[in-house]
Amino acid sequence: MRWKNVYQVVDCHAEGEVGKVLTGGVFDVPGETMFDKRNFLMQHRDDIRRLCLLEPRGSVTDTLSIVLPATHPEAQLGFVSATTTEYPVMSGSNVIALATVLLETGILPMSEPRTEFVLEAPAGLIRVSCRCVAGKVQSVRFANQPSFVYHSDERLDVDGLGLISVDVAYGGETFVLVDAGAIGLALEPSEARELCVIGEAIKCAANKRLQVQHPMNSQLTGIGQVQFMGPVVRDGSSLSSRNAVVLSPGRLDRSPCGTGTSARLALMYARNEIAVGDTFIHESLIGARLESRIERAVMEGPQPAVVTSVEGRAWITGLHQVGMDPSDPFGAGFALHDTHAWGPGDRGRHFF
């Protein structure tokens, strides 16, 4: 073989959401923080993302964690997440997949019944606790960076829907949150395509109307995801609900979305719908579940916020060595928009 740009990739999924982990071939990239390293990859080494995630090797549903040396002394390892369109500063499903891969492949030592360590994401430190039995990671719980509400009960004029009420919250990524029942959606698998099309229209309208900027990082602006919320069912101190998260550039998260769960918890707490320590079970359209809770209330700069923890499971599905033959005209990666529910004006925003 005449390959170049060879990478070792472990395939994994966390509650149905594909989360590949790049464990070899990228030793380090410049940057004083993991956020700096993310920016370097985005601006100078986007070829790695394209090679691993775009066609002909990947698909629109794939995501990637690039394992890097940590810059913070408390962290054992760092990582940068990537999707087929962007570089999120935090991804809950990727943390669950990454933690599982790190322990089950021996990159980090496993201790039973519980292994704890710290990962450094571009969003900040993520404290991880894994329940381990007989060499298998049974579940991963992570403590997220602070989550908070940007906008509450805003009226938004959306093409095809008219005026709807929305909220905007941050949980590691920024979400516009919508009551699914209020716009006639039941959150059933048969609605998957419709959810994506409507979600992209809502996101487009929200970005035109509502301004957001993270209080501790002025580079984090804009609304990237849409979360449709089902009704909440309470059983004592345990609450549960279904959701559907539309990720850029218009596809459904197969899991209930870790950062989306954190954003929803922040909104529920602001509305006095959940207390610190209450259990919240989030379920996606495929029946995947994440268990979560609010650990404590904090301030994120001037912003009232909550620290959440989210727990889920992941499974390794394959071991791959990825490379490119220099004679392959399509080897660097490509994407067609037939697999995406692009919103108006969305194409120029993404990394194609």
Name each model-derived stretch.
Residues 1-169, 176-352:
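A glycine-rich beta-to-alpha transition motif near the start of alpha/beta enzyme domains, typified by
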